[in-house]
A protein has these predicted regions:
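NAD(P)H-binding glycine-rich loop region in Rossmannoid oxidoreductase-like domains
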Residues: 1-16
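Short-chain dehydrogenase/reductase
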Residues: 13-17, 55-79, 118-126
């Protein structure tokens, strides 16, 4: 995943695409492949740059990968691998940025590869884990019918987690007792495009099925 994927693009392609191919092959090789259900986690990066005024997105929007984003390329090809594999019941969930306690320790140049006026609907690490748990439990209970499977969904923690990158930088720096980004960084240190991030117009669809938002 990013940011390691930016440093090792060829290994990223081999890992993400190869893993998808291996999983599909293993499922289809079982004596009961039609009984096996598969969930693949995609990424918001597949739809690329979505700065204002096209900052609201949904599954079904054109795939538009940012230049040099090998991670998004690998995830898109892997996603297609599952969809076209012949597996009877698959679901694709596209993950957003994950909020987790140690996010401040992730020091990498990617912090400047984010448009300061861009947006993102984040998902907490707790909601992400709850999503996977509830997927298993709801399916086991027979609550997920054919209207759920063989579709794409966006993963987000909802309207409370829709925020501009500028606001996010202010919050992060504020936890360290520092001033806003305009006091610490030069504006031209940040890119103005060629990244990814959006608010989800269809984000509630997955919540209505799996009820994972609690943060």
């Amino acid at each position: 995943v990013s940011p390691t994927a930016d440093w090792k693009p060829y290994k990223t392609q081999k890992t993400n695409i190869g893993a998808a191919q291996s999983i599909c092959k293993a499922v289809l090789a079982q004596p009961n492949p039609d009984d096996i259900k598969v969930c693949y986690i995609g990424t918001v990066a597949e739809t690329g740059d979505r700065n204002y005024p096209i900052h609201w997105g949904r599954c079904g929007d054109p795939i538009k990968i940012s230049i040099y984003d090998h991670y998004a390329i690998s995830k898109t090809v892997a996603e297609r691998t599952f969809v076209e594999s012949g597996i009877k019941n698959w679901v694709v969930m596209r993950q957003s940025g994950i909020l987790y306690p140690n996010i401040l320790k992730n020091m990498d140049p990617i912090m400047f590869h984010v448009p300061i006026n861009g947006v993102l609907e984040w998902c907490t690490v707790e909601d992400s884990g709850r999503l996977m748990c509830n997927l298993v439990l709801e399916d086991e209970a027979g609550n997920l019918g054919s209207d759920f499977w063989n579709h794409f969904y966006n993963i987000g923690s909802g309207k409370e987690y829709r925020i501009s990158n500028y606001e996010f930088e202010c919050l992060l720096l504020g936890t360290l007792g520092l001033a806003g980004p305009e006091k610490l960084f030069e504006p031209n240190w940040f890119i103005t495009k060629n990244f990814h991030g959006q608010f989800y117009a269809d984000g509630d669809k997955l919540e209505n099925y799996l009820h994972f938002r609690e943060n």
